[in-house]
Amino acid sequence: MQPQNLPPRDDPVTAAALAARAGDPAAAARFVRATQADVWRLCAHLGDPGEAQDLAQETYLRAFRALPAFAARSGARTWLLAIARRVCADAVRERRRRPRLDLTADLPDAPGQGADLGDGLALRQAVAALHPDRRDAFVLTQLVGLSYPEAAEVCGCPIGTIRSRVARARADLVGGLAERRLSAPGAG
């Protein structure tokens, strides 16, 4: 995450992106290394976790194609995560056009898979069920770790809108998880 007090050009990630734009392959590698965990995490939460690596690669392909136009008006990490968000949105639209079969639906759980796996799956499903604007704001701020101003820039909306979307996403998640627990087999 870009420190709040650094102008975009003084940020090491942005400096690496600008050097990569000028043709420095070592700077391009530094740029990818510095951002790959955030890009993958965003892709895993906004897209299909099984496709996160492919979505991250597509993000970098688009970013390096667009790098000549990058003017550093914002930080490079923010710019890159905005690209990743669009890549994930494109993937979701494509997936809706082509339904997939769930080949694991009838497989029994492996021994030792307990509540932790079920809770993690329930949380992932609850996040996936959020309204897309709320999910984006929640994932960017709570899972990727962007500040509210950075998330607002990625989403192209005011900071107050991000704050309200995150608050509503939290309320939706609490309500959705409580509802799942009450409707689970064997629940009280």
Model-predicted regions and their roles:
Residues R21-A22, H45-P49, E58-G75, E94-P99:
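Sigma70-family region 2
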Residues R85, A89, L143, C155-L182:
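DNA-recognition helix of helix-turn-helix
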Residues V32-P49, A66, V127, E179:
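Amphipathic, Lys/Arg- and hydrophobic-enriched alpha-helical face
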Residues R65-A72, A82-L103, D116, R168, ...:
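Arg/Lys-rich amphipathic alpha helix in sigma70-family domain 2
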Residues A137-T141:
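A short pre-motif secondary-structure segment
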Residues L6-V13, D90, R98-G120, R124-Q125:
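Internal acidic/polar
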Residues D54-L61, S74-R86:
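Structural recognition of an alpha-helix C-terminal capping motif at a helix-to-coil junction
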